[in-house]
Structure formats: C-alpha cells, structure tokens
C-alpha cells in the first residue's frame, strides 16, 4: 500500500514529457495556411504550407500543440503551429477587443479564442468591437462589428490538442 502511494506521488512530482501522437486524417485546404479536418470541426494552422488539397489523407504527428503534417500524395511536410476546435461561445452579443493576426483570422485579446471571418479587410490591433454570435453549430457564426463596419463570422475557435 505504501509503495503504491509512493509511486503515485513520484508520478505527480515528475510529470513525463508529452508523448508525440500520430493521426491519419483527411483534410482540405481552408484558407491561407489553414486546413480543415473534413470529418470534424477542427482547423489546422500551418506555416508557409503551399499544398492545395481537397479530401487528401495526411499523417499528422503532434507533440503537445505543435507538430507536422505529411501529405500522402506529394509526401511534402508542413509544420503545424496549432490545432483549433470550436470555442463553445453561446448565442449573444459580446464586447471584445480584437487583434488581426492574419487575413480572416482575429484573436480576442485576453482570451485564447480566435474568430474566423469571411473576406474581412479590417486591420485591428486591440480594437474594441461587438461580436454577435447567431449560431453555435459547426464552430459558430454571426458578425463582427468595428466602428460602423461589419464582417461575417464563420467560426469561433480555441487551441486544442488532438
């Protein structure tokens, strides 16, 4: 009994490094450096990945929240910066401070939540806006309003591990 308690205590004191995981998924190009897992509401953010694919099998190797994606047909490998799942926001209106990270991709300042827009050309840096969430299925949708301009929201996401 005492040995079991010591083993549990040792495991708590010395956590193991996160073991890499490998996953086979089918992905499609979503937007600049983003891919969507076709069967799930999950986005994969890559770095300088030029693969334009539709429903292609990939091997995803993850270590924590980062990793790499190997395309089955070309065998090209792209670094994965992050993986995002749906955020869980509820229908309603929210005052938020927004920063544009890249085209159609905004971060809610102070939260680990990202907004995916459709053809939004607003350049914001910690700019106050109104996020109106009208649906929550498949990542959520609605609109994002800044100083009299509005953008269509096509998803609300948060970082996750596969």
Language model regions located:
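Sec/Tat signal peptide C-region and signal peptidase I cleavage site
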Residues: 14-20
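Hydrophobic helical h-region of N-terminal Sec-dependent signal peptides
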Residues: 6-14
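Fold-core signature of tandem repeat domains
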Residues: 35-37, 58-60, 69, 108, ...
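Mid-chain, structured segments of secreted extracytoplasmic proteins
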Residues: 56-97, 138-162
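Positively charged n-region of N-terminal signal peptides that target proteins for export
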Residues: 1-4
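Short nucleic-acid-contacting surface segments enriched for D/E, G, S/T with interspersed K/R
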Residues: 47-61, 117-134
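Extracytoplasmic/periplasm-facing segments of secreted or lipoprotein envelope proteins
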Residues: 21-38, 86-113
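Envelope-exposed proteins and targeting segments
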Residues: 31-33, 54-56, 65-67, 102-104, ...
